[in-house]
């Protein structure tokens, strides 16, 4: 039978799982105009408020004046500019690694790195709640693919003990994007070491946010390159720009340049984006008060949510999901918040497990106390108290 997209769409809509795009008509900020209506934005990943920072915007403009818009080719042809190279060196220094390598997106970084490091005859071990890009990398690598219970180092240890593969790659998020919890990295690092496995961490939601200097989840736990030899980070969240990178040893990066297909066979990022990111990285390092303000905002929101009876886990970062349950109920809560002037997305399967649809609330250093208090007041009216 020929595939019928219309029938498939009807089935998605019947499950309240249909997703649609909304049109943003303003820069990313705590206040945005979306579909023609002003909203206070509590669903962006712009954790430090850098996406619309004047210095970052100015660096982008200067980059366009210096480099033009497009890079013109892949990094290995003629698209690797001095701006790209300088950013890679600065990211390597920031993460405490000998080298770093830019990728066009976080999805491409994860897909490329996992599939380059593991293949037929190897085994990839992944947390069940890893980001889709990590899971897809494992599935498409050709390696045997095993998923262990979420944040369960003992389950990973048992899986490694059963493996006879010569090459073993353990892959985890640092901060889980839909749940906001941290991977137990010290335990995972010990298990990976004892199990003769590489450990790869995607710190998309930890970089810039966690740790005294914003170096991410590894800094938060006091870990470094010996424990986590493969580190992936994104530029499109706390750093406020676009793209991603992997940081590691000289030999790792040189190998990925040769073998990571999502690096080799795609056009390089616009050099102006690299110039803007160099400035945002400098701001991350020179303005620790942004992280402190974010922590204060997270504490304020969590205290208010607890006083309203909402159950939140032990989540130290800006991702504070409120699990609703049914798809229709999450959509209705999001709609009610919109009526009160707040933008909070309803996250539904397949992004999260069935029966755990949620409001994914994200805090920014740029949010004011008044905006946070207003959201809490709106949540009290929009969300059932048993959530």
Swiss-Prot record:
UniProt xrefs under PROSITE patterns: AA_TRANSFER_CLASS_2
Keyword line: Biotin biosynthesis, Pyridoxal phosphate, Transferase
Biological process according to GO: biotin biosynthetic process
Keyword Signal on entry: no
Pathway: Cofactor biosynthesis; biotin biosynthesis
Molecular-function annotations in GO: 8-amino-7-oxononanoate synthase activity; pyridoxal phosphate binding
Protein family (similarity comment): Belongs to the class-II pyridoxal-phosphate-dependent aminotransferase family. BioF subfamily.
Subunit structure, as described in the record: Homodimer.
Enzyme class of the recorded protein, top EC level: transferase
NCBIfam families associated with the record: bioF (TIGR00858)
Annotated organism of origin: Methylococcus capsulatus (strain ATCC 33009 / NCIMB 11132 / Bath)
Database matches in InterPro entries: Aminotrans_II_pyridoxalP_BS, Aminotransferase_I/II_large, AON_synthase_class-II, AONS_Archaea/Proteobacteria, AONS_Proteobacteria, PyrdxlP-dep_Trfase, PyrdxlP-dep_Trfase_major, PyrdxlP-dep_Trfase_small
Record: residues binding pyridoxal 5'-phosphate: 106-107, 177, 205, 234
Catalyzed reactions per annotation: 6-carboxyhexanoyl-[ACP] + L-alanine + H(+) = (8S)-8-amino-7-oxononanoate + holo-[ACP] + CO2
Domain of life: Bacteria
Cofactor: pyridoxal 5'-phosphate
The protein's name: 8-amino-7-oxononanoate synthase
Annotated substrate binding sites: 19, 131, 351
Main function: Catalyzes the decarboxylative condensation of pimeloyl-[acyl-carrier protein] and L-alanine to produce 8-amino-7-oxononanoate (AON), [acyl-carrier protein], and carbon dioxide.
EC numbers, comma separated: 2.3.1.47
Modified residues (N6-(pyridoxal phosphate)lysine): 237
Gene responsible for this protein: bioF
């Amino acid at each position: 039978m020929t595939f019928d997209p219309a029938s498939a769409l009807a089935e998605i809509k019947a499950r309240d799982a249909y997703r649609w795009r909304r049109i943003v008509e303003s820069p990313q900020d705590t206040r945005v105009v979306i579909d023609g209506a002003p909203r206070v934005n509590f669903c962006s990943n712009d954790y430090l408020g850098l996406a619309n920072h004047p210095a970052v915007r100015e660096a982008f403009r200067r980059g366009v004046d210096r480099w033009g818009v497009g890079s013109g080719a892949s990094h290995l042809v003629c698209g690797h500019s001095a701006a790209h190279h300088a950013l890679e060196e600065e990211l390597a220094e920031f993460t405490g690694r000998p080298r770093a390598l830019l990728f066009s997106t976080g999805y491409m970084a994860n897909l490329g790195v996992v599939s380059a490091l593991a293949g037929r005859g190897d085994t990839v071990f992944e947390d069940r709640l890893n980001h889709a890009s990590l899971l897809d990398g494992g599935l498409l690598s050709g390696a045997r693919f095993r998923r262990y219970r979420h944040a369960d180092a003992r389950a990973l240890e048992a899986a490694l003990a059963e493996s006879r593969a010569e090459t073993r790659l353990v892959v985890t998020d640092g901060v889980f994007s839909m749940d906001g919890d941290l991977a137990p990295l010290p335990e995972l690092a010990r298990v990976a070491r004892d199990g003769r496995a590489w450990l790869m961490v995607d710190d998309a939601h930890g970089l810039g946010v966690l740790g005294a200097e914003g170096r991410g989840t590894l800094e938060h736990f006091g870990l470094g390159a010996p424990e986590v030899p493969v580190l992936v980070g994104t530029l499109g969240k706390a750093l406020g720009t676009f793209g991603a990178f992997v940081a590691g040893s000289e030999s790792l990066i040189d190998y990925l340049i040769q073998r990571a297909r999502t690096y080799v066979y795609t056009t390089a990022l616009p050099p102006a984006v690299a110039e803007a990111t160099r400035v945002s990285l400098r701001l991350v390092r020179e303005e620790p008060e942004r992280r402190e303000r974010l922590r204060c905002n997270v504490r304020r929101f969590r205290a208010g949510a607890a006083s309203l009876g909402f159950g939140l886990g032990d989540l130290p970062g800006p991702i504070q999901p409120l699990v609703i349950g049914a798809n229709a109920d999450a959509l209705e809560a999001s709609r009610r918040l919109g009526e009160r002037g707040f933008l909070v997305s309803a996250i539904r399967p397949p992004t999260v497990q069935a029966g755990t649809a949620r409001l994914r609330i994200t805090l920014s250093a740029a949010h004011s106390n008044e905006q946070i208090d207003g959201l809490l007041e709106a949540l009290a009216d929009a969300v059932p108290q048993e959530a």
